[in-house]
Amino acid sequence: MNRFVIQLIQLYKRLLSPLLPPACRFTPTCSEYAAQAFQEYGFFRALQLSIWRILRCNPLSRGFDDPLPPNTKG
């Protein structure tokens, strides 16, 4: 399931992202962060991290360097 989601993110980055103005306020970008989360964590934890990140990426946020938290569960 995670591979499928990563492929969807890559498809978004190739097809839709170039058509939109740069808007992500974080480093790495929200799509890169989500792809990393789905590579590192199980489906539900990666989904939780990705949704929380996207909710924080808005005009009221200053944005900053926000790397993926380390996976301590292995």
From Swiss-Prot:
GO terms for cellular component: plasma membrane. It is found in: Cell inner membrane. It is a peripheral membrane protein. Its main location: membrane. Keywords: Cell inner membrane, Cell membrane, Membrane. It comes from the Bacteria. The keyword Cell inner membrane applies. The keyword Cell inner membrane applies. Could be involved in insertion of integral membrane proteins into the membrane. Belongs to the UPF0161 family. This is Putative membrane protein insertion efficiency factor. It comes from Leptospira interrogans serogroup Icterohaemorrhagiae serovar Lai (strain 56601).
